[in-house]
């Protein structure tokens, strides 16, 4: 409440405040992000009502409904914080970066046990040597961060997805037969295990 009141006369719009909440910039204010996102519209409305009262010096239309808290106060609702994956998703959406950690960090040990490749090694693959090369068969445990669908000449659907682990990201081409058979898997935010063939071409980024 105090932050919103101080910013009331500044050029701080609703989207700017919500962005600050989502990326964690306001975590030090004593409430969790879910609480702040829920409360911000109510606080804004209350501050606007208070401002109008001060201007008018009397009750008016905006005072018709009694406030749950006296002027100058706000009672924060009791809400549990969002789960970590949702917090990370919002951070990435707002800043382009994960700030609290990485959603794939908890899967690193599993990826190692499964003998999975990592995106750093795949991106650095050499056509003629190294751990991985063109046409190498690889497994990649990853989170899907982007899905771009395309209709082919045969009127089937394929997809280009961005697969990410703690080391970076790589593009994965999902051909029609696989995409149509497993469409539900290829959704942003899903953690999946990909079995694919590496494609390495000169002057192009490696892809699966």
Give the predicted meaning of each segment.
Residues 1-131, 197-199, 207:
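Sliding clamp-binding short linear motifs
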